[in-house]
């Protein structure tokens, strides 16, 4: 699923630039992605859009400035793990994501079905949340999101 998500990010500037679902499935299949992987990724993206709409409607005036402290439930800690929680806190304290985006990231990480989720996959989730909202991470955060693999070719920022 995560390979499909990264491919979509690298290929399409914004989610609305993607072809319709049927054409996208055909294109992804032709490239070599498995049907199950494609279905999971597209389902995950649909749920991301629904979660974003729900939270945006519920908290329309939420800003990037919050002085509250997020307490994680045991289930969330089990799925996220300490490195992921630390990374989310770093992003929020640096004002790179706001509290609503944080909640979307957490919800989508829980929906990924992995426990604990790797930091690399959490970074893809963060990138996809920003991408789905039409927000481009600045160069420094983009480097932070993809700094791990020294042998990989450089990723392109839109």
Curated annotation (Swiss-Prot):
Q: Identify the InterPro entries for this entry.
A: Smg
Pfam families reported in the protein's UniProt record: DUF494
Domain of life, per UniProt, equals Bacteria
- Family classification: Belongs to the Smg family.
State the protein's name.
Answer: Protein Smg homolog
Organism whose genome encodes this protein = Janthinobacterium sp. (strain Marseille) (Minibacterium massiliensis)
Lineage of the species this protein comes from: Bacteria, Pseudomonadati, Pseudomonadota, Betaproteobacteria, Burkholderiales
